[in-house]
Amino acid sequence: MVVQTNRPFGRVVAIGATAAMACASLVAAPIMAQAQSNAQVSAKKDVQVIAFQQTWNTIAKECTETYGPEGVGYVEVSPPQESIQGTQWWTSYQPVSYKLDSKLGTEAEFASMIKQCSAAGVNVIADVVLNQTTGSDVAKGEQAGVAGSKYNGSTGDYPGFATKQYPDGITAADFHSCDKNISNYTNQQEVQECRLSSMWDFNSENEKVQDIQSDYLVKLWNLGVRGFRMDAVKHIHTDSMKAIKEKFSKKIGQNANDIYWIQEVIGNSSEAAGIQPGNYVQNGTVTEFGFKSEMNQYFKDKVAKLKGLNERLSKDLASKDANVFVTNWDTARNQGALTYKDGAKYQLANAFMLAYDYGTPRLLSDYKWDDGHNDDGAPGATVASVPDVDMNKECSTNNSAWNCEQRWTSTRGMIAFHNYVGDAEVTDWQDDGGDNIAFSRDDHGFIAINNGKKEKDVTYTTSLADGEYCDVYATMDCSKTVTVKGGKVETKVPARSAIALYAGATKASHPAASTATDPSDPDVSKIDDEVTATDKTITIYYKPADSTWKTPKVHYGLGDDWNQPEADMTLDEQGYYRATIDTKGKKIDFVFHDADTDQWENPEVEATTMPTPVSSRSVWPARSCPSAIPSPSGRRPVS
């Protein structure tokens, strides 16, 4: 288990390393018809599915058979440009040219995919890498990319980026002069001009670089891409990003503000002011990492604490500016987020996201991986290619190599719910202070979530009109219904489950489906908390708010016993102190103490003397997740 924070107090129940990090942070036509009918009454269609490391041919078919009929608004594809060779997924994030021949398919296949997705009513978002090229630790000397483009990762020569205007491509002169790895995130210049995990850092202020990169975006646009997810934007100055976008918009004759722009910026209040997420909304929307932290925190604690989430997150990013997710490919593989391995809690968190009224929701279609193999590429990947996947076959069971989240019964139902309720406000919030919550979306929809281990008899108030509604979380054929009478819902909510109702799916009038549930639905019959973890250690990461601290230590208690020696913390290359503690299977409370200055810190109070632990806190504050997680050499880190 890993805890990372720049805040100093937390309490966690030790549940093992394979749990998540606590942070201070067969498809039948009738099934498709169900989703399509829901989409026809949609007030909104903005759900995004991240089709991670899937080929263009695979995505094209899934657009036609699943995403379009379900009412998905966008599918996000992995970086389409040529990259370094390697089986690992992160090789896609080390470009060697902007040729559209990659491990995931050819330019012709890419164009065909876009046409097929568009015909199904699904727009394509491209994951775009503009910050860096290759890492010197994995791409030394003369090498070739997956499409054969030559480059030299030692000298910084990349002729594959050549254009008519710049026939020599990219040379060392087109990168920032700083050749050291980023270590101090309080220094904006270092973050934006030095190297992220040894990767050559484009001089984004350079007009030549801006021209080459804007030409790449034009090429994507002309092929039909209608959204751009900009990778590692924190490492690019806002003015430089604005200049690239403006060059791009002028070349295609569009208003820059009308181009859908998603920027990956991981916020951390302890870092430089100029790299905070709010600075980037001038150029487009921003990924809100705080949302996934809250999901991870409270679905492992008390979901009732999600009350007021919109207001909390809106202090940093307005809902219209935020893209939210329960997990993405990075966070899933680096702890700090719920994943499919968390079973029903993961499903419930995604249902909450699709039911709630904050941000634009992003789902993840991903393959499964074993612990310790987080860098592994898609099943069957070679150093230069990824095989096509027959999702109808892979998703005909729940034990294949792929995690078919996009086809789960709950996902289908909640996308329809989300589209139907549109911008209706959250009303009628109710909770029991613990594992059960419920709320309406005005008179459009209602959801109740039971995150507990026992079935719950509930009586909730709802703004839905009286009637018999399909429970779209549980079934696709309306074989399970819930009645609203007198503005009340009286029912039983199964353990680790939910009920979801919306005005467009009633017993009297509902979409047709031949099957109650999808065969890809995960098996969540085992209540996860009943399994005792074998790893009872916890690793705590901490960055002191006070720069005068030189020898921070962890002062901690196990259970009610605070007679433990203080744990020494060691400084890592990214500026975080860390300590690993054996919890002996007990809850752990901790504060931080600097031995030199004899100062103490916790997140609840400003303290210069030893503070009293706040025992009511059960996990780390969600807003204090750090910007980076230490990564093996050569991989693209969460940054």
What are these regions (language model features)?
Residues 1-14:
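Bacterial Sec-dependent N-terminal signal peptides
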Residues 17-27:
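Hydrophobic core
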Residues 25-40:
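Sec-dependent signal peptide cleavage junction
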Residues 38-49, 56, 62-68, 72-73, ...:
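Active-site-proximal helices and loops of the catalytic beta/alpha 8
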Residues 43-46, 83-115, 152, 157-203:
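Aromatic- and acidic-residue-enriched carbohydrate-binding clefts of CAZyme catalytic domains
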Residues 536-540:
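Structural beta-strand segments of beta-rich domains
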Residues 541-584, 595-609:
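Aromatic-rich carbohydrate-binding modules that target alpha-glucans
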Residues 608-614, 619-622, 626-638:
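Cationic, amphipathic, low-complexity alpha-helical segments enriched
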